[in-house]
Amino acid sequence: MLRGLRVVVSGIALAAFTLAGAVVASAQEPAKPVLTLDGDAAVITFLIKPDKTADFESVVAKLKEALGKSDKAERKSQLAGLKFFKSPQQVNNSAVYVLMVDPVVKDQEYDITRLIAEVFPVEVQEVFLKYKDSFAGRAITILNKVP
């Protein structure tokens, strides 16, 4: 009986040690970005369900607000390089929004919901659902300057 108890206690101690090590490792290494842009500039085309354009535009507004309120200088630089446009034309029965990024801030996160989560962690789930429900497609074009 005592031997079985030692095995259980040892197992719990090992699990706690492993978990503590994982927490320390994650605290030391910031999360790697899920979407970086590698060129000098980029054009991101979003296809949005036509009845969800107001929802998507509220996501864009929240993104701009998050970048503007961030304490990180890189986020301010990202905001300065973003320009959103809406096309009067539709593609595949979807509204077309174009995000021009010029210049790209190298090695930085460009995933919309992750950027919003940095500043608005409580609201991000609601924003994500609006984004997901409005989304019909996306294309990313990386651009490099021609000498």
Give residue ranges: language-model regions:
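Boundary at the C-terminal end of the N-terminal hydrophobic targeting segment
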Residues: 20-29
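N-terminal secretory signal peptides
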Residues: 29-81, 85-86, 142
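Bacterial N-terminal signal peptides that target proteins for export
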Residues: 1-20
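Divalent cation-coordinating acidic motifs and surrounding scaffolds
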Residues: 90
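Phenylalanine-focused residue identity feature
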Residues: 17, 46, 56, 84-85, ...
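Alpha-helical protein-protein interaction elements
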Residues: 9, 20, 47-48, 112, ...
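An amphipathic, aromatic/His-enriched active-site/gating alpha helix that lines ligand/cofactor pockets
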Residues: 63-81, 93-94, 100-147
